[in-house]
């Protein structure tokens, strides 16, 4: 494994556990602040503007149809706060359920699109990605309590609210999710195992059966990290590399599509939680450093992958 220390630019500070960055064409970055319960916009000069106060625990964000922002809301987290740092320690005391929300970024108006599937409450939706067919995949990491935790799942849903179904269950706290450039492979990472799984798709929203030593419907292991490391949210770049925020280590892990090589870009915060691509030719990586509450950027060695509804032409 190669370890790289990139030259960083700090864009904003004072964020309340930022996650879910979306790099906009105007140079701003829309993100969530989980502890603050908001969807916020960070301008290029570092100013932070609240778009909407969503309640619960807004966790991930993606641009969807019609210029609206789709948010995975985990329902709320309890935080331990110390001078200059914060980190989640479990389910919020006022938690009820998770949901998928739609936000109109110009007005801040929002609505709940989904909060259950086949009679089962969504527990803790975490990350999402849109496909070109009009649907989106999202992970439900579940919730952690003092003595027990939920089992995680992956769902596929239509953006208009007409359909949601469970696609993969169970997983060990699934977090980041993304599609390969040809949209024939779905990538999902698990937080505690620091494993990246690949699932072949036979059609939009349909997982092809795969053989695996561990579990047939779980897909193929692309990479797993050794030692005490975790995987959080991810982005896929233009060459199909899976770029995964890596807490504990405090890095963005660059996984080759075939798993043959793994590099790590070390960042100055042990809670690196998400990454996205923007800027000229999508060569700028934006990362949320959540424990210290900062948004930083650095140059990525390859262009990022253009996203449906955002910058895909």
Predicted regions and their residues:
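Sequence-structural signature of mature extracellular/luminal beta-sheet repeat domains
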Residues: 1-313
């Amino acid at each position: 494994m190669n370890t790289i220390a990139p030259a960083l630019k700090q864009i904003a500070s004072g964020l309340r556990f930022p996650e879910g960055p979306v790099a906009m064409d105007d140079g701003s970055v829309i993100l969530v602040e989980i502890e603050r319960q908001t969807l916020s916009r960070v301008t290029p000069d570092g100013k932070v503007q609240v778009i909407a106060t969503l309640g619960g625990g807004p966790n991930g964000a993606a641009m969807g149809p019609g210029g609206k922002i789709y948010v995975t809301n985990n329902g709320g987290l309890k935080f331990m706060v110390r001078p200059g740092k914060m980190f989640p320690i479990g389910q919020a005391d006022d938690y009820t359920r998770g949901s998928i929300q739609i936000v109109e970024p110009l007005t801040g108006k929002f609505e709940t699109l989904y909060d259950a599937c086949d009679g089962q409450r969504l527990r803790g939706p975490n990350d999402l990605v849109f496909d070109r067919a009009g649907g989106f995949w999202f992970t439900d990491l579940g919730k952690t309590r003092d003595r027990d935790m939920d089992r995680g799942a992956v769902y596929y849903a239509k953006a208009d609210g007409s359909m949601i179904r469970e696609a993969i269950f169970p997983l060990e706290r699934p977090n980041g999710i993304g599609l390969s450039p040809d949209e024939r492979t779905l990538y999902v990472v698990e937080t505690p195992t620091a494993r990246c799984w690949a699932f072949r798709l036979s059609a939009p929203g349909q997982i092809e059966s795969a053989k695996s030593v561990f579990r047939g419907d779980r897909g193929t292991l692309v990479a797993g990290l050794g030692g005490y490391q975790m995987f959080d949210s991810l982005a896929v770049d233009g060459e199909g590399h899976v770029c995964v925020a890596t807490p504990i280590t405090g890095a963005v892990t660059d996984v080759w599509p075939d798993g043959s090589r793994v590099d790590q870009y070390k960042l100055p915060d042990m809670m690196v939680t998400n990454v996205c691509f923007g800027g000229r030719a999508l060569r700028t990586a934006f990362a949320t450093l959540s424990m210290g509450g900062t948004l930083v950027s650095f140059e990525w060695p390859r262009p990022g992958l253009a996203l449906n509804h955002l910058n895909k032409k």
